[in-house]
Amino acid sequence: MNSTPRTVLAVITACALLASLSAQPAPSTISHWQRASETPIVSPQGEAWESAGTFNPAVALFHGKFVMLYRAQDRAGTSRLGYAESTDGIHFQRTLAPALSPLTPYERGGGIEDPRLVQFGDTYYLTYTAYNKKDAQLCLASSRDLVHWQRLGVILPAYKGKWNVGWTKSGAIVPEKIGGKYWMYFLGTSADKTDQMGLAYSTDLVHWTEALDTPVLPVRPGKFDARVAEPGPAPILTNDGIVLIYNGADDKLVYRTGYAIFDRKDPRHLIARSSDPIFAPEKDWEKTGQVPNVVFVEGAVPQGDRYLFYYGGADKYVGVAQAEVSGATASTAPHK
């Protein structure tokens, strides 16, 4: 009875090792990474829906404004999405009420977590994790103004994957069609209990099919991503390929930032991967919070020859960093 799980685990482990060995070290596509603010730009406040944590944000440009959707958590552990605006990308003004609160059976209890944004035409698509205290599942919503949202439901159900046998989370959608399909990197849990990155495709953004029988970006023993390899914001399209910022956790669950480059004509093909992290928790507010020692990038906005990268610090605060991205093309992030 126990031979099948061991066989599956052996196959997944072998495929992961082969994928890691075949990828080359990443070129200097991303350089001069540094904090754009030494202190948090959004912090918990009040006694209600955002009292325990404000973290893991998605950000888009809309009519000249920076619009942030961030995960807000109350002291009971329920998450909602807060809304904030800025003219400079650093100083944000928040609304009094959340933008999205748990309503559906698959959201009630734990709530709505970890947003990521991508734009196609005049429509913004929001991937988020719905958690009902039992299952975490990847969901989708759409909007034309980033204020009024239409839920489109669960797009990758938990426990029904190929290699991923648990929850589904963290959908980072490539911001252009490739081969007539939409492509999305996501987080799944493999048979060995590690959280690894998968890939799915769709023709309508609502119905998704896994593209591979194994993780597209596996964890690497002994590295900064030994336990977790989780997508960050929507990938950036560059001359080098599809650049995906991702969040890696080591065996001590310290979260750091890396990046991977996939073939622009074939999102399944990993070209290169950073050997070492490009960003790590250093500030006190990145080391101490609801979860210690975490920097977790989820938002990216182009600004001239650089990008602003928005991240969660210790599952409690929002921070912002900046870096240069060489060879980035025009349609690389949500904008209008």
Predicted feature locations:
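Bacterial N-terminal signal peptides that target proteins for export
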Residues: 1-11
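Bacterial N-terminal signal peptides
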Residues: 9-20
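Beta-rich carbohydrate-recognition and catalytic domains
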Residues: 21-110, 118-227, 236-293, 304-336
